[in-house]
From Swiss-Prot:
A single BP term in Gene Ontology: L-arginine biosynthetic process
Protein name: Acetylglutamate kinase
Family assignment from sequence similarity: Belongs to the acetylglutamate kinase family. ArgB subfamily.
Organism: Methanothermobacter thermautotrophicus (strain ATCC 29096 / DSM 1053 / JCM 10044 / NBRC 100330 / Delta H) (Methanobacterium thermoautotrophicum)
Enzyme kind, highest EC tier: transferase
Entry-linked InterPro entries: AceGlu_kinase-like_sf (IPR036393), AcgluKinase_fam (IPR004662), ArgB (IPR037528), Asp/Glu/Uridylate_kinase (IPR001048), Glu/AcGlu_kinase (IPR001057), NAGK-C (IPR041727)
Site (Transition state stabilizer): K25, K251
Molecular-function GO terms, alphabetical: acetylglutamate kinase activity; ATP binding
């Protein structure tokens, strides 16, 4: 395609999303190296300069696990959620708020954006409560057993005020998935859930989840079976029939919930592909899976 045609193809999208909030979730698995993070930060700045209002939520699961291993702690997950004791919570804060958040903020600023780093504690952005213990049933004895996840939270409410104030003043908010409870305790939150809930809370037009797979696949072992567009109802059927499973399940449920809460479209795309964000937003074909009502 001629370079100029790329710009012409982008125009309807630039018009449609002018001044609209776009929630972008930078997944820990998508941020494979500094170059990938830098490229995504630059694309985020481009979105801002063509008139959209990007808001970033980042993860960092793999990096937290690496830090835990270095400190001699073994990471443990139950249904995708990290079991978080006091010491793990300190590591989570250090990695997410101290390292990843500041790194994304400085990369966005380097490319000319005005990024501000926040966690869910700032201005009570993410009020959370400790999750109830996970109940498992022993297959043999049928006995019920409770497993406490520790300092893991579920979101009670999102206060969009601080985010709106920042986007209204041309800043790009960058949010760490850490919540606060009513007694000021820190809680570890799943970053996908945070992205979905904040997207709904701020009335975002789009939720874009950057991860390490091409999107939702009909056959998870075959990248050629990518589903490019799907409605929430069709997707809910795929979930019920067990076609969407494993690591894709929480992301898929987050997208379904976001659409049901009023976000116009949700996208799952491969963040390892350079400029996947721009290809998804500005081209007709897109690059990943787009979910709509
Ligand atoms: C996550 C927070 C980071 C995250 C964790 O501790 O790994 C819980 O599991 P990704 O890269 O998006 O997976 N929190 C409760 O979600 O990062």
């Amino acid at each position: 395609m001629k370079t100029v045609n790329i710009l012409v193809e982008a125009l309807p999208y630039i018009k449609k999303f002018h001044r609209k909030k776009i929630m972008i979730k930078y997944g820990g698995h998508a941020m494979i190296d500094e170059a990938a993070m830098d490229s995504t930060a630059r694309d985020t700045v481009l979105l801002k300069y063509v008139g959209m209002e990007p808001v970033v939520v980042h993860g960092g699961g793999p990096e937290i696990s690496r830090a835990m291993n270095k400190m001699g702690k073994e990471p443990k997950f139950i249904e995708g959620l990290r079991v978080t004791d006091e010491e793990t919570m300190e590591i989570v804060k250090m990695v997410l708020v101290g390292k990843i958040n500041t790194s994304i903020v400085s990369k966005i600023c380097y490319h000319g954006g005005r990024a501000i780093g926040l966690s869910g504690k700032d201005s009570n952005l993410l009020l959370a409560r400790k999750r109830a213990p996970h109940v498992v049933r022993d297959d043999e004895t049928g006995e019920r057993r409770e497993i406490d996840l520790g300092l893991v939270g579920e979101i009670e409410s999102v206060d969009p005020g601080i985010i709106n104030m920042l986007t209204d003043n041309n800043y790009i908010p960058v949010i760490s998935p850490i919540g606060v409870d009513r007694d000021a305790n820190t809680l570890n939150l799943n970053a996908d859930t945070v992205a979905g809930e904040v997207a709904a809370g701020i009335g975002a037009e789009k939720l874009i989840v950057l991860t390490d797979v091409p999107g939702i696949l009909e056959d998870p072992s075959d990248p050629d079976t990518l589903i490019r567009r799907i409605s929430v109802d069709e997707l809910s059927d795929l979930v019920k029939s067990g076609i969407v499973e494993g690591g894709m399940l929480p992301k898929t449920l987050t997208c379904i919930q976001a659409i049901n809460d009023g976000v116009s479209s949700a996208h799952i795309i491969d963040g390892r592909v350079e400029h996947s964000l721009l290809l998804e937003i500005f081209t007709k074909k897109g690059i990943g899976t787009m979910i709509t009502e």
